[in-house]
């Protein structure tokens, strides 16, 4: 009975231990890992709108809108990228910056250069304030301008994201309340910068604290959304820009245009929309005109691409690199897109290409992210190509363009190369979606957007039911077997006690002593006295019928020593 109870007790302990280990394993396996979710816009959204929800509380989400609208002899297409930040506390932190949006526009070779503002202007959203030498240029996010009177369609973005209506040429950025401050085009660049700075300081008061007035644009913190469309008389071979580039330091992107003279790019100064000036030179056969001010300072760059007969194919792009630890901190994106015609597609980390039928428009974006430990300086920033006024695009050789289009990755922070290569080759080059297949209210052709950031997550353990069962068996069987063996060994040791009855010699000695104690042995012995010794010797006689009373013989018991009775009439008896 005791043995069975002990065995049951050991088995119960082993079962409880196995159950506890199984629960811990199941909780570790089924722990919810961060995943990216897709949201479907309502039916009232414009066609070609895609919204990607953030996969972490402080990660940025990308909203890409593709609106191809043919218009007469000229056609326009806008690729607007909106970035939003969602936070679980309800208010964004003060160290998060997100501003990425832009389009690329090119007029027909037959159409004249627009007299209003150029198709695209350059702006920046830095996170650090530094000074800029007068001769330096900054490649930044391309913000297209739009003529007055044109409206943009609203786009539903996740969590308190507002769509900014487009602004007319020379106007400042509009605030959330819809107030517009229109500025008259000024020939002088200094006055235009001052007016633009004043307008942007007033319109960006609701988005974050004001910075010193010495800079052209404010740093927009928290949720930021921008919408812009190019000039209706321009064709836009477009591609969705990079969603976001997360890093603890500002990132700069050099445009892929071949320079005659280059200058360093500090990560601060912004450029304002440039008015029509006599110093602008345009080339019909080049890959893109460079708009410069008469003083020699580059003010804007108009990106050009394929002719009007080409139907561009959008390539949904995402961040080719990004650390999970760095995603919750600063996120500054400086991006410049420059399409080149008749260029073969190339697969490289940081270079995204899109084939558009007979003509290939390659939008090359090169990213350079300084490491957190290196201070921001001229040595940590890439070279940005600039061009003096009066230089035509057609004079640039293709070899220089190819050399300049290569990605500049100096002082890049530590990031896995496999993530960059797999993201660039698997999701940006091999998944070319036609522009006309995106419909409102559906999530078709955008399932691969959530796959781009999967390598950034931590490695999760995926076990099936059979795997869990095998793990349980492998843990429980050794424990139960060991418990049974220990129980049996302990019970056998308790049985082996010292018992003399098991010895055979003990019983032999006991039997012998008992026999001699119960059965006496009589040994006859003759004792003669001194008086009758001679008579007995002369006349020996034996008692008749064993009567030794009248004789001088003495019976001696061998077991009783030192007992002698000497006499004729005394006989010792047993």
Swiss-Prot record:
Residues 173-406 are annotated as: Interaction with DST (isoform 1). The chain crosses the membrane at residues 9-29, 468-488. The lineage of its organism: Eukaryota, Metazoa, Chordata, Craniata, Vertebrata. The gene is Tmem108. It comes from the Eukaryota. Residues 489-574 are annotated as: Interaction with CYFIP2. It is found in: Membrane; Postsynaptic density; Endosome membrane; Cell projection, Axon. It is a multi-pass membrane protein. Expressed in the nervous system tissues, such as hippocampus and spinal cord, is barely detectable in peripheral tissues such as heart, lung, liver, kidney and muscle. In brain, highly expressed in dentate gyrus neurons and expressed in cortex, olfactory bulb, ammon's horn, cerebellum, hypothalamus and striatum. Glycosylated. Residues 58-86, 245-271, 316-332 have a biased composition (Polar residues). GO terms for biological process: cellular response to brain-derived neurotrophic factor stimulus; dendrite extension; dentate gyrus development; modulation of excitatory postsynaptic potential; neuron projection development; positive regulation of neurotrophin TRK receptor signaling pathway; postsynaptic density organization; receptor-mediated endocytosis. Disruption phenotype: Mutants are viable and show no difference in body weight or locomotor activity. They are impaired in sensorimotor gating, spatial recognition memory and suppressed fear memory consolidation. Spine density of dentate gyrus granule neurons is significantly reduced compare to wild-type animals, which is associated with decreased spine width and increased spine length. This is Transmembrane protein 108. The keyword Nucleus does not apply. Residues 132-160, 292-312 have a biased composition (Low complexity). Residues 32-352, 364-417 are annotated as: Disordered. Its main location: membrane. Transmembrane protein required for proper cognitive functions. Involved in the development of dentate gyrus (DG) neuron circuitry, is necessary for AMPA receptors surface expression and proper excitatory postsynaptic currents of DG granule neurons. Regulates the organization and stability of the microtubule network of sensory neurons to allow axonal transport. Through the interaction with DST, mediates the docking of the dynein/dynactin motor complex to vesicle cargos for retrograde axonal transport. In hippocampal neurons, required for BDNF-dependent dendrite outgrowth. Interacts with DST (isoform 1). Interacts with SH3GL2. Interacts (via N-terminus) with CYFIP1 and CYFIP2; the interactions associate TMEM108 with the WAVE1 complex. Pfam families: TMEM108 (PF15759). Keywords: Cell projection, Endosome, Glycoprotein, Membrane, Synapse, Transmembrane, Transmembrane helix. GO terms for cellular component: axon; axon cytoplasm; dendrite; early endosome; endosome membrane; glutamatergic synapse; postsynaptic density; postsynaptic density membrane. Residues 31-169 are annotated as: Interaction with SH3GL2.
